[in-house]
Every structure is written in structure tokens, then in C-alpha cells.
Amino acid sequence: MVRIQRGKLLAFCLCVMATVFLLITLQVVVELGKFEGKKFKNSHLKDGHAQMEAEPLHLHPFFNREGLTLNRKKTLAADSFPIMLWWSPLTGETGRLGQCGADACFFTINRTYLHHHRTKAFLFYGTDFSIDSLPLPRKAHHDWALFHEESPKNNYKLFHQPVITLFNYTATFSRHSHLPLTTQYLEGTEVLTSLRHLVPLRSKNHLRKSLAPLVYVQSDCDPPSDRDSYVRELMTYIEVDSYGECLRNKPLPPQLSNPASMDADGFFRILAQYKFILAFENAVCDDYITEKLWRPLKLGVVPVYYGSPSIADWLPSNRSAILVSEFSHPRELASYIRALDRDDRRYQAYIEWKLKGEISNQRLLTALRERKWGVQDVKQDNYIDAFECMVCTKVWDNIRLQEKGLPPKRWQADVTHLSCPEPTVFAFSPLVPRRRSLREMWIPSFQQSKKEARALRWLVDRNQNFSTQEFWALVFKD
């Protein structure tokens, strides 16, 4: 009888909690709906904001993926939720009340919230960050947050001091970011120590009769890192099997020709047969590390790495990769690889960490353990969720400070949050000219992006809407 009474009491409590949550959510929907029903008609809006007239005016039903539990001590009113406005269609969500620990914020891509009094932060996605449309004038309580996990080739102007310092919060590949995404392509330690795809060295030696010691798979040709020029020169000193669109000399099976198959077991089996993989990033930036590195380490193949200058800080072991930067010329690199190819003991030293399942790099272990998001893990938030919650929490922290009569804490990004030098080119001999794509596109693009960054900063600091004509006139003023 006591158990039945307890069960009824528990059910009653749950019903009450659910009712309270629904009432709060309904109030928020009604209040925001009243605001959203008012269409902006500002004659002062210029090119970038004219498109707001076409924004949808219906409200997406609120939902909360984890269930909203409010702290009673906060005594939050229904209209107290800060609005986080995505200045990008990235999430596709026109309205969502999301919980971030004990805090809650309203996330939306609907730009009709631009002038709402509860809009506290604007969230930008770096790849589609554009001068054509910015939320200006920027009010004192408007925070700007940048999510940019990709290389500089997607938007060079972000990588210069005048622009990156416009943002209060960042989530980038840099360890110095407020939400570092350095390990965004690595699921965890288990995939590094797994022997699932490992091909024994004896078998690899046998396969060498028909395979080159090195394999190269790239279909994004002539990127800012100029990797194809290096590999082309390397090919004159050692055999390289190239399966991608770039420098291809060996075809993939038809069923693996689709780029979507790059994570297929069949593709992994092909790569795992090789002793070495050329792991060259498309850009050279501190902490910019992609699947180019992690894939060979997962497969038990030694990566020959070119990319992040800080890569040694992230390798699982002191001897787990060959770094191109340690060789003065592809000729020296080829000689070293041939020596390892002939000497099983020296080669084995590069995969010893994997065979023993030992990751000695404490920085890597700590980063994986402490990150607040997961990779392909339904039990964890993804990094976009984590970014949203980071901004939401920081906004709430400042709200609480102001409620105590204290000034809000000001955050600002700096150039270490996206650290990429100007692209350079490889020119190994007069017979191998510099790649036209770099000379005629990437380097001038980087140089012009400096002017664009200065012009954009001046216009944003003016804190008025501006046209694309104004922007480009300022860029080419000198």
C-alpha cells in the first residue's frame, strides 16, 4: 500500500512539473510571438539588411532536447530568456528554447529578432560570414560569437587582427579559442589504440611487391599549402601511389570513387596496406589538424605529415609520425622513408605505441577528456551545441553580475584564435615552376584580405549600416 501511495505521489509530482514547464514554454512562445508578429520596416536599412523584410514571420514551435529544469532560486519570469540569434542559416532552427546546465536561452536564425530587447548575442559561422549583411548598429549589450572550424581558404579576412577582434567569443581549431575544436576529427583514444584495421608488418612487406611505400589521396588540388607541388617533387625520388584527383596515377575501385566513401571500410582496407601515408593539410595553421593525420594513425599506417607547425603537441607519441618540416628537401625525406622501408626494426618504432595501446601525450589525453562535446557520439553534445551553450552561459554570467550591481565581464578574441601565416610556395628547382594557382590566387587573396579586414573594421566601428559599394571603395582606396 505504501509503495502504491509513493507511486501515486511521484506521478502527481511529475505531472505538476510537466504542467509548470508547459506553462512557462507557452508564455515564452506567446511573448516572443507578439514581438515576431511585428515586421520590421526601417527605411534606413541598406543592402545588407534589406533582406530582413523577407524573413519568415511564423514561429517555430519551441522544443527542448533535454528537458528544461529551472533553478527556483533564479525565479525566472517567462520573458527572461536571452535570445541567441544565429546570423547564419547553419542550424536551420527558427526557434528553440535550449537548456545549458542551469541556464536556458532561446536560439533562432530568424533575423526579425535583430532589434528585440532580449537579443544578447549574435552567432556567426565563419564560412558564410559576409560583409553583405551584418547586425548593425551594434549595441553595447550585443556580443558577437564566431564558430569557425575550417581552414582559412574559406574566409581569409577572419584571420586578421582587425576582424577576429570584433568577436567576443570563439570556437575555432585553435587551442587558444574559448571553445577549442582542435580534436574535432578525433572520436577518442579508443580509435587510436584500436588494432581493427592494422595490417601486420610481415603482410605489408609482402604487399610492397605491388604497392608503393607511400600513398597519397587528395581531390582538393592546389590548396594554399601547395601540397601538390611538394608531392610532385617527392615523386621524382620515391614511388607514390596517388588515388585522388590530384596527381592521380592509380584508380580506386568504382564503388569507392565517391567522396562519401572516404570513411568506408573498403577504403580503409586499401590505405591500411601501405606503410606510409602522405598526410598533407590544405593550409598551414597552428592547431589546424584534420582527418589527414588521424586517419593513418587509426589505421596503423605511419603519417608523413605537413601542416600545423604545432603538430608535435598533439601526436599520441613522440615517435608516431614523420614530420616533413624536419627535412630540408623532398630528396632527404625520400631517403629517410626508403631507409625505414628496408629496416623493420626502425619502422616498427613508429607503430610501437599503437601495438602497446599506449598514448603518452598528456596534452592530447587531457583535451579529449575535458572537451565538452563529442564526435559521432549520440550520447554527447556536438560541437555546435557546445558552442551555443558556451555563449548562453557567458551571457547569463554577465546578467548575474549586473543583477548584483557589478559591471559585466568583457571577452574579446585575439589573433591566436585563428593563427595562419601568409601562404608560401615550394620552388625546388628552375625546372619546376611555382604553381600558378598559388601565385595567382592564394597569395594575392591573402594580401587583399588584409585590406578587406581593415576596411570592414573601420565600417563596423563606425557602427552604421553600410553598402557593399562603400566597403569595396574603402578596400581599394589606396
UniProtKB/Swiss-Prot annotation:
One of its GO terms (cellular component) is endoplasmic reticulum. The chain crosses the membrane at residues 10-30. SUPFAM superfamilies: UDP-Glycosyltransferase/glycogen phosphorylase. It is found in: Endoplasmic reticulum membrane. Residues 1-9 are cytoplasmic. Residues 31-478 are lumenal. It catalyses: L-threonyl-[protein] + GDP-beta-L-fucose = 3-O-(alpha-L-fucosyl)-L-threonyl-[protein] + GDP + H(+); L-seryl-[protein] + GDP-beta-L-fucose = 3-O-(alpha-L-fucosyl)-L-seryl-[protein] + GDP + H(+). Its EC number is 2.4.1.221, 2.4.1.-. Glycans are attached at N110, N168. GO terms for biological process: fucosylation; N-glycan fucosylation; positive regulation of protein secretion. InterPro entries: Alpha-1_3-FUT_met (IPR017176), Glyco_tran_10_C (IPR055270), Glyco_tran_10_N (IPR031481), Glyco_trans_10 (IPR001503), GT10-like_C_sf (IPR038577). It holds the Pfam family Glyco_tran_10_N. It is a single-pass type II membrane protein. Pathway: Protein modification; protein glycosylation. Disulfide bonds join C389-C392. Keywords: Disulfide bond, Endoplasmic reticulum, Glycoprotein, Glycosyltransferase, Membrane, Signal-anchor, Transferase, Transmembrane, Transmembrane helix. GO terms for molecular function: alpha-(1->3)-fucosyltransferase activity; fucosyltransferase activity; peptide-O-fucosyltransferase activity. It is an enzyme of class 2 (transferase). PANTHER family: ALPHA- 1,3 -FUCOSYLTRANSFERASE (PTHR11929), ALPHA-(1,3)-FUCOSYLTRANSFERASE 10 (PTHR11929:SF194). Protein O-fucosyltransferase that specifically catalyzes O-fucosylation of serine or threonine residues in EMI domains of target proteins, such as MMRN1, MMRN2 and EMID1. Attaches fucose through an O-glycosidic linkage. O-fucosylation of EMI domain-containing proteins may be required for facilitating protein folding and secretion. May also show alpha-(1,3)-fucosyltransferase activity toward the innermost N-acetyl glucosamine (GlcNAc) residue in biantennary N-glycan acceptors. However, this was tested with a library of synthetic substrates and this activity is unsure in vivo. Belongs to the glycosyltransferase 10 family. This is GDP-fucose protein O-fucosyltransferase 3. It comes from Bos taurus. The lineage of its organism: Eukaryota, Metazoa, Chordata, Craniata, Vertebrata.
